[in-house]
């Protein structure tokens, strides 16, 4: 529906509140009140910087995982102290330090990857990437699929579905996100870089 944007005098506070709301996953609806309301919980700039520090991301565990595309596959799970999302990498073929891997960064997409949605081509792209990596492994190389838990390009499943409703009204993806007060691009690609570093992939 229609909305009205109003400039704020306390822009820095609002920007920080927006970032905290994004981290908490409660966008697009929240209230910012500059007046004191009960006991305050102080948040320092360093707290946000600490949360965004991808050096905290570590390998939690790994296991052999034969898949349809390739019997020789391994899944690697990653965790960070301050982030509840668990990203995974799927290693196709035998990992070798002297071979540059075929890499795909794939953002989680429940509707496309699992449900076969026709609103996106995420599912077919995922299948094609795994097939290409299997071919690479058959030739003696290897591949790494980085599956990032960043649904809807980082805006979350519920907000993605809200954007779908707006798209049905004639708005494109960017316009729909903007009308919901969401960024055009919210994926965190630094996480993918850290995952590759932990996997020992110096080149892609």
Model-derived features: positions:
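Catalytic domains of riboflavin
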Residues: 1-204
